[in-house]
Amino acid sequence: MNFRQRKPKAKILVVDDEPHNLDLLYRTFFQNYKVLRADSGPEALEILEESGEVAVIISDQRMPKMSGTEFLGLTVNKYPNTIRIILTGYTDVEDLVEAINSGRVFKYVTKPWDDDELKALVKQGVDTHNVLKSHTEELRRALQQKSLLYTVTNTIRSAPDYQQMLQRIVESIGKMFEVSLAICRPV
């Protein structure tokens, strides 16, 4: 038997204070994505805190308690790779331009939206998120390697004798790879 491991569905978060729109967004995306729902910015922040990073956030702009751009702005530092899409039935030009220019919003879509266009936009957002995550991980690994090389070089230069140099190198490598014990033994 050939069992293929299924790739987990990308997570998206939809935020709208109108139950009909929230349900419509859920039904549009649930087959292809794991869809999380919130009816306000504060609730969406709680959901993100519980479930972690999502690939795409689709948020209504005009909501009580917190606007869409305010909510999305609060997610930027903690979830920098998340793609943010704003829905609006109104033209809050100043807010939208500021949000887009500051990098908080990937695209904005006017209500009523075209399902096919929104699906294509979310797919593009998920793909972009995956590329960003991959590049971020590559950069993290490269930085870790450079840091290790720097640490080993400094250890070699500062160690008073060969045995201490080897022990410090092993300890440095152990710290870098987050192991609980690193031992240097002669063979």
Label each PLM-derived region with a short phrase.
Residues 63:
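Receiver (REC) domain active-site loop signature in two-component systems and cognate sites
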Residues 52-58:
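Active-site beta3 strand of CheY-like receiver
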Residues 159-187:
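Helix-loop-beta substructure at the N-terminus of cytosolic sensory domains
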Residues 16, 60, 88:
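Active-site residues of response regulator receiver
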Residues 69-70, 91-107:
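Alpha4 helix (beta4-alpha4-beta5 surface) of REC/receiver domains from two-component response regulators
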